[in-house]
UniProtKB/Swiss-Prot annotation:
GO biological process: lipid A biosynthetic process
Post-translational modification: 4'-phosphopantetheine is transferred from CoA to a specific serine of apo-ACP by AcpS. This modification is essential for activity because fatty acids are bound in thioester linkage to the sulfhydryl of the prosthetic group.
Alphabetical list of InterPro entries matching this protein: ACP (IPR003231), ACP-like_sf (IPR036736), PP-bd_ACP (IPR009081), Ppantetheine_attach_site (IPR006162)
Function recorded in the entry: Carrier of the growing fatty acid chain in fatty acid biosynthesis.
Gene Ontology molecular function: any one: acyl binding
Disulphide linkage map: none
Naturally occurring in which organism (per UniProt): Citrifermentans bemidjiense (strain ATCC BAA-1014 / DSM 16622 / JCM 12645 / Bem) (Geobacter bemidjiensis)
Residue span(s) of domain Carrier: 2-77
Name recorded for this polypeptide: Acyl carrier protein
Superkingdom: Bacteria
Keyword vocabulary terms for this entry: Cytoplasm, Fatty acid biosynthesis, Fatty acid metabolism, Lipid biosynthesis, Lipid metabolism, Phosphopantetheine, Phosphoprotein
Pathway(s) served: Lipid metabolism; fatty acid biosynthesis
Length: 77
């Protein structure tokens, strides 16, 4: 679990251009980390590539925070 969590935080920081220290499990991509809708699409694509999964558009809309991403990836890998 820790490795998935760490990798997701690294991807979020890289995709959104923020310091990894700002990325907490509770961080909302839009509200806390300044992402816009295009950023979130690119973030989902990066997660799909990293973890070799496909995230449906419906599920992608539900992934709004770092913890949402951790939970989704953990449940689907």
């Amino acid at each position: 679990m820790a490795s998935i969590e760490k990798r997701i935080k690294e991807i979020v920081a890289e995709q959104l251009g923020v310091d990894e220290a700002q990325v907490t499990n509770e961080s909302s991509f839009m509200d806390d980390l300044g992402a816009d809708s295009l950023d979130t699409v690119e973030l989902v694509m990066a997660l799909e590539e990293e973890f070799e999964i496909e995230i449906s558009d419906e599920d992608a809309e539900k992934i709004q925070s770092v913890q949402d991403a951790i939970d989704y990836i953990t449940d689907h890998t």
